[in-house]
From Swiss-Prot:
Homotetramer. Interacts with HSC70 as well as DNAJ homologs and HSP90. This is Hsc70-interacting protein. Pfam families: HipN (PF18253), STI1-HOP_DP (PF17830), TPR_8 (PF13181). The keyword Repeat applies.
């Protein structure tokens, strides 16, 4: 099953636990039936539910008050992380990386190794900037050796330049993705920046590739903070899922209410249209009980009424006030038909009705 759908389902179940009254809504009737068919018990509906049902008609007539959405909580509101030891990021220009496409000769490899040894000596003497410069010289001579970038990254960490260290580690991992030292120094650089989750990931991977006490000690420091951030994020993901479900249910409810309202309006229009035709059997004014010249047999029962009312020309004529007034006049006194012999609209309707019933006007 789709993991997103499972997440939404979990959020929906939590929502129902928090508010069991949701299970008594009309749109969740199918869920109640299923739970009960499986032997489950639905908590009783809140007392307000029956009251809501009895006052449903009145509520429908009143305009709905807009639902006030709760003020959004800040995602940082309840997240407190100890950021001791976190420093401002370094914004120096990117360091030299060497040409990775250069063809390295044996002589260049030897020279790079000499520069590396000089850099290590400078590092042991505490001359960090000299060590960086020498490692840079070695990298330019042999830009495809991952350990050189990792070594320079370690010096950048000591110089409190975590972004530079991360750039070196990224290049080293591109060359050799299985170097534990590279992940260790990148993890330490992320720790300096307060990137707790990234730091925990890199330090854990470093220990997995090649256990290191220094990396393990720092992992124990950063992991609780990384877990706290992850739990905080999951909490707000759950809130967002619950909010999405509530909004979806509200949209379904509004759509259903709108559909029902449209049906009621349509029914009211049909009833109003039928009422225009008075007491004539099936809807024509005045009853018109078989009194037209020629008899129009069967009018009292109007066996062909449905056919008549489905004729668009008849319906159009019925909407004409002049025609309906004449029709009412003739219905009350058939002798008055002579008054309308020269009115084509009236005579057209009478002719059509006579044809429907098999008689002549």
């Amino acid at each position: 099953m789709d993991s997103r759908k499972l997440g939404e389902l979990r959020a929906f179940v939590r929502l129902c636990k928090q508010n069991p009254g949701l299970l008594h809504t009309e749109e969740l009737g199918f869920l109640r039936e299923w739970v009960e068919s499986m032997g489950g018990t639905i908590p009783p509906a809140p007392a307000s539910t029956s009251t809501d049902e009895t006052s449903k008609g009145k509520a429908e007539e009143q305009p709905e008050e807009p639902v006030k959405s709760p003020e959004p909580e800040s995602e940082e509101s309840d997240l407190e992380i100890d950021n001791e030891g976190v420093i401002e990021p370094d914004n120096d220009d990117p360091q030299e990386m060497g040409d990775e496409n250069v063809e390295v000769t044996e002589e260049m490899m030897d020279q790079a190794n000499e520069k590396k040894m000089e850099a290590i000596n400078a590092l042991s003497e505490g001359d960090l900037q000299k060590a960086v410069n020498l490692f840079t010289d070695a990298i330019k001579l042999n830009p495809c050796l991952a350990i050189l970038y990792a070594k320079r990254a370690s010096v950048f960490v000591k110089l409190q330049k975590p972004n530079a260290a991360i750039r070196d580690c990224d290049r080293a991992i591109k060359i050799n993705p299985d170097s534990a030292q590279t992940y260790k120094w990148r993890g330490k650089a992320h720790r300096l920046l307060g990137h707790w989750e990234e730091a925990a990931h890199d330090l854990a991977l470093a220990c997995k590739l090649d256990y290191d006490e220094d990396a393990s000690a720092m992992l124990k420091e950063v992991q609780p903070r990384a877990q706290k951030i992850a739990e905080h994020r999951r909490k707000y993901e759950r809130k967002r899922e619950e909010k999405e479900i509530k909004e979806r249910m509200e949209r379904v409810k509004k759509a259903r209410e709108e559909h029902e309202r449209a049906q009621r309006e349509e029914e009211a229009r049909r009833q109003a249209g039928g009422a225009q035709f008075g007491g004539f059997p099936g809807g024509f004014p005045g009853g018109f009980p078989g009194a037209m010249p020629g008899g129009m047999p069967g009018m009292a029962g109007m066996p062909g009424l449905n056919e008549i009312l489905s004729d668009p020309e008849v319906l159009a004529a019925m909407q004409d006030p002049e025609v309906m007034a004449a029709f009412q006049d003739v219905a009350q006194n058939p002798a008055n038909m002579s008054k309308y012999q020269n009115n084509p609209k009236v005579m057209s309707l009478i002719t059509k009705l006579s044809a429907k019933f098999g008689s002549k006007p």
